[in-house]
């Protein structure tokens, strides 16, 4: 096997991003600073693509998305969000893969997923269909745009997901809960509280949906529930505090738009979320999907089960799961396989020469990788991953310049390996020479 020469090239290629759209396009670039104003408060129908610059599918969609934007100009708004750069905005709408396209129609707080084709014609057809539905909704009395969310505090339907707390219910609901709570202390006469209310209500619904109820938004009338107001030193309105199990409450000091609130809530959720999945490479679909949908995929090649047994393998997997949890905010993919199970993958990554276990981090967009040179231990892997996150290290092209062929195989059953059983040989009919007459 030809040696793969590892050039001393900066690992910054892993983190390099370039937007796919420019100001000269008819595609409107959206960011956390303008999304609420441009999309949510707009009466227009919007098609929004959430993309990552390194995503191959996104790059292939780009010319078609631009074509659709030009065709729909002054009819339907077509936008794009660099969700790799603006994680909070992508997380706010549950974006887990790229590209994700959402249609913001009559109910801007509940966009629909676009499931159609990836051609300009298919996108335009879907947009016009959604536009017809928007007009029908308006004829039927449903209003589009932001005004539908601006209801007073007396309208319970607008704040159905905001949990009202009192002196009597607070401790049981909040302090005894395993969930994260964001609590607004308000006064009914407070103008700032009235301005915050529709944003808080809209955020509560989105956060509930995105976190499956693991982060809750609540409200306390501090003029009535004075025990709570005194306990937490409420001096002005509105005051928002964050409560987490076993920790002292902290003040929320972020922005007061729905987007800002949701962003902070999702950060809190990710801090308490489970680690990413650590998947065994048993098919080409698993390997390619994990690597293509993430900026990096971390691939571990563990020793053969006969060399470690189940206990030894599980100890390696525990280390990998621990580190996947530590680096979960990076949104990397995590894969593992057994030595010899995916020989073409090992060859392409130059794995095996250093023995097993081994690890490589792959950038599937650029078909380059970085190889773990240190020890396959928690400390050694952590140093390797930390260097990657800082954009440092040595890289090399993936052998063959393309994703290697993956062999389909059965997943590990969790048990120790077994040596193949050898057939017993019947020696009863074999004539053996007299040992005393052996000749040299």
From Swiss-Prot:
It catalyses: Catalyzes the rearrangement of -S-S- bonds in proteins. It is an enzyme of class 5 (isomerase). Its EC number is 5.3.4.1. Coiled coil: none annotated. It is found in: Endoplasmic reticulum lumen; Cell membrane; Melanosome. GO terms for biological process: platelet activation; platelet aggregation; response to endoplasmic reticulum stress. Residues 20-132, 124-287 form the Thioredoxin domain. Residues 139-160 are annotated as: Disordered. Residues 1-19 form the signal peptide. Its main location: endoplasmic reticulum. Disulfide bonds join 55-58, 190-193. GO terms for molecular function: protein disulfide isomerase activity; protein-disulfide reductase activity. Pfam families: Thioredox_PDIA6_C, Thioredoxin. InterPro entries: PDI_thioredoxin-like_dom (IPR005788), Thioredoxin-like_sf (IPR036249), Thioredoxin_CS (IPR017937), Thioredoxin_domain (IPR013766). The modification Phosphoserine is found at residues 129, 156, 158, 428. One of its GO terms (cellular component) is endoplasmic reticulum lumen. Keywords: Cell membrane, Chaperone, Disulfide bond, Endoplasmic reticulum, Isomerase, Membrane, Phosphoprotein, Redox-active center, Repeat, Signal. Part of a large chaperone multiprotein complex comprising DNAJB11, HSP90B1, HSPA5, HYOU, PDIA2, PDIA4, PDIA6, PPIB, SDF2L1, UGGT1 and very small amounts of ERP29, but not, or at very low levels, CALR nor CANX. Interacts with MICA on the surface of tumor cells, leading to MICA disulfide bond reduction which is required for its release from tumor cells. Interacts with ITGB3 following platelet stimulation. Interacts with ERN1; the interaction is direct. Interacts with EIF2AK3. Belongs to the protein disulfide isomerase family. May function as a chaperone that inhibits aggregation of misfolded proteins. Negatively regulates the unfolded protein response (UPR) through binding to UPR sensors such as ERN1, which in turn inactivates ERN1 signaling. May also regulate the UPR via the EIF2AK3 UPR sensor. Plays a role in platelet aggregation and activation by agonists such as convulxin, collagen and thrombin. This is Protein disulfide-isomerase A6. It comes from Pongo abelii (Sumatran orangutan). The lineage of its organism: Eukaryota, Metazoa, Chordata, Craniata, Vertebrata.
